[in-house]
């Protein structure tokens, strides 16, 4: 618990330190990025480097806050999540982008006229939106689980697997990917136990796979954890049986943070994997609402930090291309009006030049 408290204190300290006064540009921003994690900051970085006016609004609640380090990210493996984000914010600001601490309450309007309203009633206008708010991991309602999250209660073998290698690992069945999750963790330890929990024990091919890999399947509902000296030491079943374990893997229900988009008709839907809900997007990151893109865990629940950052950059590039197209169409329309209007200032100047010739300056 002390580790979680320390992490929370560090996050709050950053969040309050980042409460800055942002003076909105006269015509609003080209893009408001909602969410200041890896996807949002990398997207903002791309947009700022493309000379777009961009504002990042960050609620300061990153999904990976309980983790001690980010893993699987080249040249940054093991870096504390808060430190990585601090570097990202500095890079965005270095190119003229703005980062603001705040929580979005609602979004209204449409492309070229979105209004993003915060919970403290501040409001910002944007031509386009990039949604990178991530997701919330909803854990099973088992006493003690949330206090161990990100420590000895883990979910991703690629994010946390190395740290629990060769330990006594348990896998709590909570969804359709439970057997697959157990097989992945078997790669990291020869001592893996599969807890069926409220589901029926595996049968058929699934049972055969577990047996072939030496994974013991334990029936019965899990009632709680056994923690000794702030370390997980066992999993307690409802009948009182305790199975010694030092790490427990669980698949949470992953829920996209997207409720604030209801005002523009954009809502999260069930993910095809059955693991939670997400915002669906096309191959470019575009949502079904014109002018709105999304990237990172809000649309791809399984994305790690590197994947999320890459998705943010790619969506930002597509978004910038869309703005370039809009700017060009507006410029062409203005150009056509100018050359087609015989009484425009440009045409009158041209007529004067043709009539007066070289004497026009002396008239």
Feature roles, as predicted:
Residues 4, 9-31, 99-167, 247, ...:
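FAD-binding core/adjacent interface of flavoenzyme oxidoreductases
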Residues 147-163, 254-306, 314:
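FAD-site-proximal beta/loop scaffold in flavoenzymes
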Residues 151-158, 171-181, 203-204:
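Active-site glycine-rich loop that binds ribose-phosphate moieties when present
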Residues 23-24, 29-83, 167-168, 177-200, ...:
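Beta1-alpha1 glycine-rich phosphate/pyrophosphate-binding loop at the start
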Residues 35, 132-134, 141, 172, ...:
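Short, well-ordered coil/turn residues at beta-beta hairpins
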Residues 86-118, 123-126, 189-276, 324-363:
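A Rossmann-like FAD-binding core segment of flavoenzymes
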Residues 181, 295-335:
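A conserved FAD-binding loop/helix module that cradles the flavin
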């Amino acid at each position: 618990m002390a580790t979680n408290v320390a992490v929370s204190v560090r996050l709050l300290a950053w969040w309050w330190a980042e409460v800055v006064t942002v003076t909105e540009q006269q015509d609003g921003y080209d893009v408001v990025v909602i969410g200041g994690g890896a996807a949002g900051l990398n997207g903002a970085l791309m947009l700022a480097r493309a000379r777009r006016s961009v504002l990042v609004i960050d609620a300061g609640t990153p999904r990976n806050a309980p983790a001690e380090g980010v893993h699987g990210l080249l040249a940054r493996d093991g870096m504390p999540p808060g430190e990585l984000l601090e570097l990202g914010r500095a890079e965005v600001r270095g190119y003229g982008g703005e980062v603001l601490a705040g929580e979005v309450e609602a979004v209204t309007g449409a492309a070229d006229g979105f209004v993003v309203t915060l919970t403290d009633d501040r409001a910002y206008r944007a031509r386009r939106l990039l949604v990178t708010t991530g997701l919330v991991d909803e854990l099973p309602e088992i006493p003690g689980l949330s206090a161990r999250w990100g420590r000895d209660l883990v979910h991703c073998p690629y994010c946390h697997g190395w740290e629990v290698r060769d330990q006594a690992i348990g896998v709590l069945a909570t969804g359709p990917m439970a057997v697959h999750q157990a097989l992945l963790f078997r790669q990291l330890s020869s001592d893996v136990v599969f807890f069926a929990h409220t589901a029926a024990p595996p049968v058929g091919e699934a049972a055969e796979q577990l047996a072939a890999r030496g994974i013991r399947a334990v029936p019965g509902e899990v009632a709680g954890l056994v923690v000794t000296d702030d370390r997980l030491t066992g999993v307690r079943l409802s009948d009182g049986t305790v199975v010694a374990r030092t790490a427990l893997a669980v698949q949470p229900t992953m829920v996209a943070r997207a409720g604030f988009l209801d005002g523009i008709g954009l809502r999260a839907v069930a993910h095809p994997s059955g693991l939670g809900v997400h915002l669906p997007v096309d191959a470019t990151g575009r949502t079904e609402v014109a002018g709105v893109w999304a990237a990172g865990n809000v649309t791809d629940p399984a994305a790690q930090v590197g994947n999320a950052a890459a998705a943010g950059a790619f969506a930002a590039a597509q978004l910038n291309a869309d703005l370039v197209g809009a700017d060009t169409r507006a410029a062409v329309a203005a150009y056509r009006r100018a050359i087609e209007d015989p009484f425009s200032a440009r045409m009158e100047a041209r007529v004067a030049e043709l009539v007066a010739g070289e004497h026009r300056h002396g008239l």
